[in-house]
Amino acid sequence: MAAKQLAFDVEARRALEKGVSTVAQAVKVTLGPKGRNVVLERKFGSPVITKDGVTVAKEIELKDPYENMGAQLCREVASKTNDVAGDGTTTATVLAQAIMLEGLKNVAAGANPIFVKKGIDRAVETVVDEIKKISIPVESKESIAHVASIAANEREIGELIADAMEKVGKDGVITVEESKGTATTVEVVEGMEFDRGYVSPYFVTNTEAMEAEFEEPYILIHEKKISAINDLLPLLEKVVRTGKPLVIIAEDIEGEALATLVVNKLRGTLNCAAVKAPGFGDRRKAMMEDIAILTGGTFLSEDLGVKLENVDLNMLGRAKKVKIAKEKTTIVEGYGKKEAVDGRIAQIKKQIEETDSDYDREKLQERLAKLAGGVAVIRVGAATETELKEKKHRVEDALAATRAAVEEGIVPGGGATLVHAIPAVEKIQAEGDEAVGVRIVRRALEEPLRQIAANAGLEGSVIVERVRSEQPGIGFDAVKEEYVDMIKAGIVDPAKVTRSALQNAASIASMLLTTEAIIAEIPKEEKAPAMPPGGGMDY
């Protein structure tokens, strides 16, 4: 085991503070509409230019192991806020630094860190209640576009996100991809789409697009392979009598079963197609159950104990339209009962809440979207690769912030909400060192607005005092450099972002205040390579 070095008390806290401040200094210049850029070196390719707090924070690694611990904790504030709310990383970093610096001053002067922490927690709770009280629900397309435009710093992106959300609903999946051209567009896949196509090209009905399209088909959803035609014949005869097409989704269709389907299709006896089931293992089973619920059919699994030859028409699913391409299948407007689909959606949402795995969560979100109404793809275009990366990042940020706004509503932006929460904090009854903790938060609430003003080249203290004296909801528009009603001016933040930023900042800062010792590995000294043995020079 490598030897460790230790630091205690004031020395420990000072080292951590230095690390936090280093990260905060780099991150906070990006805050606000007039935030400055940070350029990040890349070993390969062009440098990255960004205004995104969490990207800057993740780049920073310090040489001193103690200071690096502080830097990592500061990174944690930014990334945690980003994970929960998708935005507010810079605000969280500014708040964490403010709470920590004020707190360390007081602890060094003899305040008890435990009571200081208690005061900080009480003040944060009060501010969170204030945020919840004043938050305004986001429902209209226009207000969604507003929120997204602010997060992305661009109206066009805001409109695209609002467009995508309107089309796929609040639970729909919206993915961000790089476009081949320079334009940024939204593409919507309606209905349920999965990445499996027809088993044989003979099933194609539209030779130009190489797709099989069926109106109001019956859909057989079978867990196992189908190879014997005798199992399938009774069902085929029933479907032929109805004159409707048949789509078979199974693990695989092969041998004489496939040959018979192809022959019937070519003769015009039965319009049909076979598709392999999507996914693998347990996920395949779950996806096929989803398809069954969406189409109002029965998933014919082994557990059900129903043989293929005994399948009735009422066990088959139905849909308004099914489109099958070489590598994807889309089921539009399944005829499943709304209550059954809603029940399945609620079940998947519960699984999303309970899972710890990011991968599982992503896959569950995809399943949820497919049931809830579709998937939208925002294709981001730009003139250069550097611009493309930066723009794609902004779109992803704006998307997460917009989801947060739809979830918990919006509050006045630009740091105004935190400043207007100060009177509520001042009313808290606290004594001794607990009152010190409350005062620390009260002072920290001014910092985001102060920093926004500083980045715009103005005097922060003057602006903070002016906003404090105004009615709640009035804040400072750093672009126009005037005092406005923030909601009317469209300068808003998702309530979830403001709340998460404060809670995460206070959590890390108060943890640092109560730190009494830090342990790190002793850095290895790199020895200079030995000189090669000299042998004189050869000429």
UniProtKB/Swiss-Prot annotation:
Binding site for ATP: 30-33, 51, 87-91, 414, 477-479, 493
One example of a Gene Ontology biological process annotation: protein refolding
EC category: isomerase
Family matches, as Gene3D superfamilies: GroEL, GroEL-like equatorial domain, TCP-1-like chaperonin intermediate domain
Subcellular locations according to the entry: Cytoplasm
Record text on subunit structure and interactions: Forms a cylinder of 14 subunits composed of two heptameric rings stacked back-to-back. Interacts with the co-chaperonin GroES.
Enzyme Commission number(s) from the entry: 5.6.1.7
Pfam families referenced in this protein's UniProt entry, alphabetically: Cpn60_TCP1
UniProt catalytic activity: ATP + H2O + a folded polypeptide = ADP + phosphate + an unfolded polypeptide
Broad class of the protein's primary localization: cytoplasm
Family, as annotated: Belongs to the chaperonin (HSP60) family.
InterPro entries: Chaperonin_Cpn60_CS (IPR018370), Cpn60/GroEL (IPR001844), Cpn60/GroEL/TCP-1 (IPR002423), GroEL-like_apical_dom_sf (IPR027409), GROEL-like_equatorial_sf (IPR027413), TCP-1-like_intermed_sf (IPR027410)
GO cellular component: cytoplasm
Keywords: ATP-binding, Chaperone, Cytoplasm, Isomerase, Nucleotide-binding
Function: Together with its co-chaperonin GroES, plays an essential role in assisting protein folding. The GroEL-GroES system forms a nano-cage that allows encapsulation of the non-native substrate proteins and provides a physical environment optimized to promote and accelerate protein folding.
Name this protein carries in UniProt: Chaperonin GroEL 1
